[in-house]
Amino acid sequence: MEKDKHSHFYNQKSDFRIEHSMLEELENKLINSRKTERAKIQQQLAKIHNNVKKLQHQLKDVKPTPDFVEKLREMMEEIENAINTFKEEQRLIYEELIKEEKTTNNELSAISRKIDTWALGNSETEKAFRAISSKVPVDKVTPSTLPEEVLDFEKFLQQTGGRQGGWDDYDHQNFVKVRNKHKGKPTFMEEVLEHLPGKTQDEVQQHEKWYQKFLALEERKKESIQSWKTKKQQKREEIFKLNEKANNTPMLFHNKPEDNQKQKEEQRKKQKLAVEAWKKQKSIEMSMKYASHLKEEEEKEKKRQKERQRQFKLKLLLESYTQQKKEQEEFLRLEKEKREKAEKAEKRKTAADGISRFQERDLHKLELKILDRQAKEDEKAQKQRRLAKLKEKVENNVSRDPSRLYKPTKGWEERTKKIGPTGSGPLLHIPHRAIPTWRQGIQRRV
């Protein structure tokens, strides 16, 4: 498809080279716009990627200091803000593109319906015209037999493009429907432009002027036909009276031979004039009957076309409902995916916050542990310094005497100063418990 498009665009011998040049210029603008937008997005993503790389590099060499932790927190907040800003910008762009896509689809649907209506209208109108032409001969209608108002109305229709004023039936019906809805007030212009995307405001204003003139001429035509019917009825009564008088006149003078020839000639002239008036009236009646027949056929064809359009609109309505249902299902699916993505993102954010919180806690514990170890090392070093100072104060001037190892110690000498009985004599008395007086003299049973 891209190849066919370029073959039309760059074909110098094409009949639509000017239109293709305009499309080519528009396409180049859109391509440049897409390139600029792509470069901007790549720049934003590269910036976020670099910040993430810096954060990863900082996490490889963790320092248990409050300044380092604060720096990591600032870097994470900066990355999070950049990602949220990027997502919000893209969301707004996508929403705008979706609105433009819906508007374009509505315009394409309206144009497609219009083309289908043209196809149906042209074929059916041609069939109806052939049927009417075969039923009634054309030479029966002459401009001289029709009233002036009818001729003006028909001439106006021929000069301005028929009963739709040169518009197709779909656009004209929408125009009339909206105009009747607002009862002809000027406020209906804006709504007409919404229903007819292919028409400009000047075209709608010109069609409104034409339609006002059309209604005025049609009203004059109806009044003229009504007046013609009244006159026809009056002439019919006059002709009937003349015929009745002509039939009764010979009977009145039948028995009078003295009637002269002059009266007979006058009577014949009156009869001839009455017959000519009757023929002319018949011709006018046939012309009006044919015009009425044409109008009836036109009304029937219009009803048939309205019925076809109604069925076609029902079909389009069904298709639109089906399409709308599919779009709604797709929208719900996308909303579900979006909601799931948001939940996952929220979970990831919660996990990231938890990891960050745990990392901060671990860093705090590590910092406390390092501080405790440092305090113990400082205390130990201080103790060593204190002992060294004490050693420096004490003087050791003891001479070496190996023979003192064989001498008794002071403690031993103190023990040997007082020596008690050795206990080597015979054991003559063994102490026993005293015997109560009331048991003395009682022998012990064995």
Swiss-Prot record:
InterPro entries: CCDC148/CCDC112 (IPR039902)
Biased composition range(s): Basic and acidic residues: 255-268
Single GO cellular component term: centriolar satellite
Record bears the keyword Cytoplasm: yes
Region (Disordered) location: 247-277, 394-430
Subcellular localization(s) per the UniProt record: Cytoplasm, Cytoskeleton, Microtubule organizing center, Centrosome, Centriolar satellite
Coiled coil stretches, renumbered: 23-116, 219-400
Highest taxon above the source species: Eukaryota
Keywords linked to the UniProt accession: Coiled coil, Cytoplasm, Cytoskeleton
The UniProt record lists the keyword 4Fe-4S: no
PANTHER family membership: COILED-COIL DOMAIN-CONTAINING PROTEIN 112, MUTATED IN BLADDER CANCER 1
Name of this protein: Coiled-coil domain-containing protein 112
Source species of the chain: Macaca fascicularis (Crab-eating macaque)
